[in-house]
Amino acid sequence: MYSISFQEDSLLPRERLAKEGVEALSNQELLAILLRTGTRQASVFEIAQKVLNNLSSLTDLKKMTLQELQSLSGIGRVKAIELQAMIELGHRIHKHETLEMESILSSQKLAKKMQQELGDKKQEHLVALYLNTQNQIIHQQTIFIGSVTRSIAEPREILHYAIKHMATSLILVHNHPSGAVAPSQNDDHVTKLVKEACELMGIVLLDHLIVSHSNYFSYREKTDLI
């Protein structure tokens, strides 16, 4: 009896999706489809609702580790891995959509986008965004991921991708895992070096952003270095 109910647990939302479209489904139903089956103690709908009840918002699901997912009743290692894979794929799709020929209108707009991408990272990430003459992003490159004490990559590496993608300008973005966005002396030094190197190559350094989960610092807005 149990095996039959397990197999049919998520059948109804699947049928609804096929008939009414994915937009018609609730978060619980979508999660039930991904989880597929319940347990002897709880249906897949109950498990899906328990997962959602543990979140203050859907974005919290993206932040959960494998261990945290497995700690939820009804989710084993395989389901936790499948959920993480689904979440990451959705994140990459969203990233590609927002990146593809996006026009940069303001530091604030870009900072908000990069806060979502880098704000919760536990290590420092340096990212370079390369733009064309219409200020549209044509390429995004992670220059390095590492300790906050490590020196940022040489300007040569940053400019390599600018030349490769025929960019006319670029924007640097890095996160401060501490949450404080005030620039360090090293941040100032790197900004000066990259700007000087860009000028030699006829490329414009539009901005250098420092982001955290809830705040940002713009060299263009706050300093005379750019």
UniProtKB/Swiss-Prot annotation:
GO biological process, one term: proteolysis
Xref: InterPro entries: MPN, RadC_JAB, RuvA_2-like, UPF0758, UPF0758_CS, UPF0758_N
Span of domain MPN: 103-225
Signal peptide residues on this chain, from the entry's feature table: none
Keyword Transcription: no
Database matches in CDD domains: MPN_DUF2466
Superkingdom field: Bacteria
Binding site for Zn(2+): 174, 176, 187
Molecular function as annotated in GO: metal ion binding; metallopeptidase activity
Keywords per UniProt: Hydrolase, Metal-binding, Metalloprotease, Protease, Zinc
Segments carrying motif JAMM motif: 174-187
PANTHER family: DNA REPAIR PROTEIN RADC, UPF0758 PROTEIN YEES-RELATED
Protein family (similarity comment): Belongs to the UPF0758 family.
UniProt protein name: UPF0758 protein SP_1088
Source species: Streptococcus pneumoniae serotype 4 (strain ATCC BAA-334 / TIGR4)
Lineage: Bacteria, Bacillati, Bacillota, Bacilli, Lactobacillales
